[in-house]
Amino acid sequence: MKVTAAFAGLLVTAFAAPVPEPVLVSRSAGINYVQNYNGNLGDFTYDESAGTFSMYWEDGVSSDFVVGLGWTTGSSNAITYSAEYSASGSSSYLAVYGWVNYPQAEYYIVEDYGDYNPCSSATSLGTVYSDGSTYQVCTDTRTNEPSITGTSTFTQYFSVRESTRTSGTVTVANHFNFWAQHGFGNSDFNYQVMAVEAWSGAGSASVTISS
């Protein structure tokens, strides 16, 4: 969900701890998970077999929603997508989104966003270059907030693309490996989706996931 902590700097040590190897999971079975958190706040439709979904929301959306398609078990496999995404004046993300079971963490690889950059109000971890662009990387701790296990305290990880885009291939492993230098578990994955999230304003998205 959205990040609200105050921005703080972070010194990066010269020698990083050993990084867990990413877990590769076969996706031969195709998309098998529908993310529908408060999809009733807009018009959410999807075709799981085709790997497509759409979300339309009107100004005055009353709460946070996260909708999308993906996999019951996440991995560091690359994800290729194409989208039509419009969120001008909306606090919204178009992102690879998912959870790690332990240490519990929520993560976003933000490809495009509306009027709010989550790294503007979180702890900076620096930058990582991937897929033709620099990504700002940041983290936040959420205390007693909704999670995959109910209400809990967990860490959020964000990579926010500076040269925003609405189609391409996301090399997920590049982000997981960078985050792992800062406590990201890089294993024991819960679900992973290509998602749209918003909690204000109006917007629309039509997304196709091809891998």
Swiss-Prot record:
GO terms for biological process: xylan catabolic process. Its EC number is 3.2.1.8. Pfam families: Glyco_hydro_11. One of its GO terms (molecular function) is endo-1,4-beta-xylanase activity. One of its GO terms (cellular component) is extracellular region. Residues 28-210 form the GH11 domain. The active site is at 106 (nucleophile), 197 (proton donor). It is an enzyme of class 3 (hydrolase). Disulfide bonds join 119-138. Pathway: Glycan degradation; xylan degradation. Gene3D superfamilies: 2.60.120.180. The keyword Disulfide bond applies. Belongs to the glycosyl hydrolase 11 (cellulase G) family. This is Endo-1,4-beta-xylanase 3. It comes from Aspergillus kawachii (strain NBRC 4308) (White koji mold).
